[in-house]
């Protein structure tokens, strides 16, 4: 979604005003122009799929265009004005599809080269003003082995949305390759979600949740990590990614420990992360943001848009003596947070001090999330489809000096892979952090996770 000061016009000369969602309003607070911040050309989501089987590029082009026609948010602009902004839906336009040959040359394994191809595209800029907010790249090793990469702007999609897009794209591709069009029900559009939020802004459920958060976050600030260098207002961000995969034994222990403790893996990982923040900052009362899918009602499960929601997790470890105690606090904090989830913008209205670290040039807020794969495709376990098979490239091990960006701070993401491994990434601004610091944080986290899953009665004082 592009942000502009003048309402763009549709082909018939009209511009229908659609209200912004709370998340779109929140993103506007991090608007730093077209090259940085929430609407910058690197605030993007780029994902890749390994493709096995012959690809009909004409059918792929038609399928991409079908997806843009189906999901309005991919052709929507955010308009800034004195009334707080609005969004405008544009007519469908062709998706840019770039086809590249990836011939075998230096003996590098194809899996590695596929990841390199994905990383190169992840590092590229995609201006938010260019519609539609979807670009596709097909890298071909040969006629039956390829990599498909989809790039979107993060103000128009989220991680869940990309799974929906890919599912719909595969359905449209198979129909087009067979000479027809996909028979899919009408999509629920993101603008309907924005209206739903406005219509339910003062409901009883919202009021009860706001009361919960006011009490839960009383006196709290999001915990920031001291950066190696202070932020400089005139220096644009320079994000990179440190990637890692924990060994199979540790990954197995974490998953089994979570099951034994009647927790989700996220609760275990969040407990370890809270202890990491405690050790790095010296505070025992930590608050860190995570992300949810933001889809409060089932009817939005198949919708595309920036639904993702900032959810603050407060874990007070002040009177905890062991790692097991911290896990108990983590479980309770997570359950309470998700039971009372509302748009973060509403939480921030009632707890403005929560965001203070974002204005502190010496602190960086590092959000922590566990990725969700909502719609696994054939390559990850589904029947014998007609045509090529698609498997998402989730096990990524190659770090990037230059990557897609986030509006501010850092982002720590974990993923429980289909084979049980724990993979992760830490996205950080090179202007504020050294890569050595990122590696140290990951190693400290690994140490804490090992202790928590293997010896939960370990006293915190002995870590």
Named regions from a protein language model:
Residues 24-51, 81-106, 130-135, 145-147, ...:
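Acyl/amide activation-and-transfer machinery of modular secondary-metabolite enzymes
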Residues 1-36, 61-109, 117, 132, ...:
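Short amphipathic alpha-helices and their capping loops
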Residues 2-15, 52-69, 88-130, 249, ...:
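A short, small/polar-residue-rich loop/turn motif at beta-strand boundaries
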Residues 17-19, 132-192, 438-451:
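Active-site-proximal acidic secondary-structure segment that organizes catalysis
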Residues 1-27, 373-382, 423, 432-463:
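Flexible, non-catalytic linker and terminal segments flanking ANL/adenylate-forming cores
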Residues 11-16, 35-44, 61, 72-73, ...:
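His-Asp-centered acyl/peptidyl-transfer active-site segments
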Residues 71, 75, 166, 284-291, ...:
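Extended, hydrophobic beta-loop-alpha segments that form or line the acyl/peptidyl-thioester binding
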Residues 51-75, 150-167, 240-282, 301, ...:
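Acyl activation and transfer enzymes in specialized metabolism, enriched
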